[in-house]
């Protein structure tokens, strides 16, 4: 068994999860299920100079890339709506503790969605949301 593959072997059923976030609590549970595998691979990736490609894909499959979207676009409003700051901080802290590069990539994703929402055309906002929903 490849112990470096995601999702973590103890959470192999995670790949069948729907991408649409049902609630913040469920999303944080999905994140917590991913983190053992993320942490396991982080040291190896740091040593190799590799990128956390599988980890980003796992975040997408778990619906975490959608969570920062406003509810009107299918997200949970993490960082984009009132009440979304604390869950976002919790997620960033957990991801960053397991893998700082992955945490920074997720932070950049959140910031990019916020910038497009603030300054983009309606078409650009919908395109960014569709990309997030696609993982």
Each model region followed by its residue ranges:
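Alpha-helical interface subdomain recognition
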Residues: 2-90
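Glycine-rich flavin
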Residues: 53-61, 66-135
């Amino acid at each position: 068994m490849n112990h470096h593959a995601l999702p973590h072997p103890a959470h192999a059923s995670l790949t069948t999860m729907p991408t649409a976030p049902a609630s913040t609590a469920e999303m944080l549970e999905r994140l917590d299920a991913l983190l053992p595998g993320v942490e396991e691979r982080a040291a190896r990736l740091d040593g190799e100079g590799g990128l956390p490609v599988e980890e980003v894909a796992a975040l997408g499959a778990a619906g975490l890339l959608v969570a920062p979207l406003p509810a009107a676009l299918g997200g949970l409003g993490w960082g984009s709506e009132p009440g979304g700051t604390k869950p976002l901080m919790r997620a960033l802290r957990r991801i960053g503790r397991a893998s700082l590069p992955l945490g920074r990539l997720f932070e950049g994703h959140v910031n990019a969605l916020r910038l497009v929402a603030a300054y983009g055309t309606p078409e650009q906002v919908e395109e960014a949301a569709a990309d997030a929903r696609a993982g």
